[in-house]
A protein has these predicted regions:
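Short, flexible, glycine/charge-rich loop motifs used to bind or transfer phosphoryl groups or to couple energy/partner
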Residues: 1-2, 23, 108-109
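Conserved N-terminal beta-strand and adjoining loop/helix that marks the start
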Residues: 1-19, 65, 88-92
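Conserved Nudix-box catalytic region and its N-terminal flanking loop in Nudix hydrolases
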Residues: 18-56, 161
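Short, glycine/charged-enriched secondary-structure capping and boundary segments
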Residues: 26, 36, 81-82, 135
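Short secondary-structure junction motifs
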Residues: 30, 62-65
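Nudix hydrolase/Nudix homology domain
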Residues: 31, 109-166
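Unchanged
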Residues: 40-63, 73-131
Length: 166
């Protein structure tokens, strides 16, 4: 089986028991809650990627970031003969609510980006049915049982429609 590597940088923002998430519109995590963040651009530092991606996906700048850590998952989509080794850098982030929220880029608003709007989701609602493996890593961390080893998701089901259950 072929394994493809993917590296991304993501923000973890928790307020009053709710996690800042974005709704993925494409890819293996579509129609699930995911963390704001994504791939580095050529020559971009980790925190530069973090700031750019959070701004692009939420419209907010960061007032601070801390606690960098790394996790990884192996995701094999149902019916595919390859898997993606998703390596992720997480930072705890605090959004700058003092400044005005920037308008989301045209690509987010017109649906050509891989994410839609930002939402605050209660941690207890995070299940494999509703959340990406990244969010599940954060949930385990918040429950005091961080998954330090690579987590494998074989036969990952890509959702082709948004779930209507809560």
């Amino acid at each position: 089986m072929e394994i493809k590597n993917h590296f991304g940088v993501y923000g973890v923002c928790l307020q009053e028991g709710k996690l800042l998430c974005i709704e993925r519109t494409r890819g293996p995590y579509q129609h699930r809650f995911d963390l704001p963040g994504g791939s580095q651009e050529l020559g971009e530092g980790l925190t530069e990627t973090l700031k750019r991606e959070v701004l692009e996906e939420t419209g907010y700048t960061l007032s601070r970031y801390s606690n960098p850590r790394m996790y990884d998952v192996l995701v094999q989509e149902e019916g595919q003969d390859f898997a993606v080794h998703h390596i992720m850098a997480f930072y705890d982030i605090v959004l700058d609510f003092e400044g005005s929220q920037k308008s989301l880029p045209h690509e987010v608003l017109d649906g050509s980006n891989d994410s839609a709007n930002a939402v605050w989701v209660p941690i207890e609602q995070m299940t494999q049915e509703h959340a990406s493996p990244l969010v599940l890593k954060v949930k385990a961390e918040l429950q005091g049982f961080p998954e330090l080893d690579m987590t494998s998701y074989k036969n990952w089901k890509v959702k082709h429609a948004k779930s209507t259950s809560s």
